[in-house]
């Protein structure tokens, strides 16, 4: 490879790239512009990998119901999720486990390691690679009966998520899908609490084209696979997010996650 040109994906850390090329005459170039269009639309085999990965994710989330309880920590839950994925042959990403007030931070990274308590509400966002293809899903766990406010917020997020799935059809504009799902939350008075895009593509990379976000006007195509994941995050209180993966197929949109979207009350 001396004197050659190597394109690096956006997911490669600069320090790793330097380690790989310092002793060579390789010219490094940004490969994201090359790889992104190639990964945007999946063929049928790739979609089958994503279907199988999502079935495994469903099973992991189902098994998790038997583990979450007062007294365990967020980190305990995260480690158990990774164990469940590994047991099924997956290579897990570190999951989001955000309980109580931590759920009010959309991108909470587990730094608090809070102990689960009675009456907690917990965001669990998990995924893993199976056959090199990534799955992704978010569900909500409630320790005991939710409050009236939690029920209200959950119903709003669920309605927005359902609208997002219904609008995600062949030829639909991602920006329009985001707008219509977001409108549900805005109309309910929580627009300022929905602070991120509606969804992202997934495949070999957990976050890739197409992005379901304002400004993306490229119509959805056969082979696209992406998340629909609206959320409401109430500062200092709690958060709610619900996420499924959708694939655009020759016969129409297909929801890859089969696990029920109703509240999981333990």
Language-model segments: which ranges?
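Active-site neighborhoods and metal-handling regions in enzymes and metal-associated proteins
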Residues: 1-266
């Amino acid at each position: 490879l001396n004197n050659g040109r190597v394109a690096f994906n956006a997911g490669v850390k600069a320090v790793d790239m330097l380690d790989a090329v310092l002793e060579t005459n390789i010219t490094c170039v940004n490969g994201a512009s090359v790889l992104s269009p190639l990964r945007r639309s999946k063929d049928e085999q790739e979609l089958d990998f994503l279907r199988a990965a999502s079935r495994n994710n469903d099973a992991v989330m189902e098994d998790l119901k038997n583990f979450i309880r007062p007294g365990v920590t967020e980190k305990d839950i995260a480690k158990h999720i990774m164990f469940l994925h590994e047991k099924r042959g997956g290579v897990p990403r570190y999951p989001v486990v955000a309980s109580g007030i931590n759920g009010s931070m959309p991108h909470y990274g587990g730094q608090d390691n809070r102990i689960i308590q009675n009456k907690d509400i917990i965001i669990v966002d998990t995924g893993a690679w199976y056959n090199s293809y990534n799955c992704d899903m978010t569900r909500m766990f409630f320790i005991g009966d939710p409050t009236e406010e939690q029920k209200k917020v959950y119903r709003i997020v669920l309605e927005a998520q359902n609208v997002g799935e219904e609008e995600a059809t062949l030829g639909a504009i991602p920006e329009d899908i985001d707008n219509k799902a977001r409108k549900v939350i805005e109309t309910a008075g929580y627009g300022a609490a929905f602070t991120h895009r509606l969804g992202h593509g997934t495949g070999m990379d957990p976050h890739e084209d197409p992005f379901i976000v304002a400004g993306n006007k490229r119509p959805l195509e056969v082979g696209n696979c992406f998340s629909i994941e609206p959320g409401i995050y109430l500062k200092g209180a709690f958060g709610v997010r619900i996420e499924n993966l959708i694939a655009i197929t020759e016969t129409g949109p297909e929801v890859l996650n089969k696990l029920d979207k109703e509240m999981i009350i333990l």
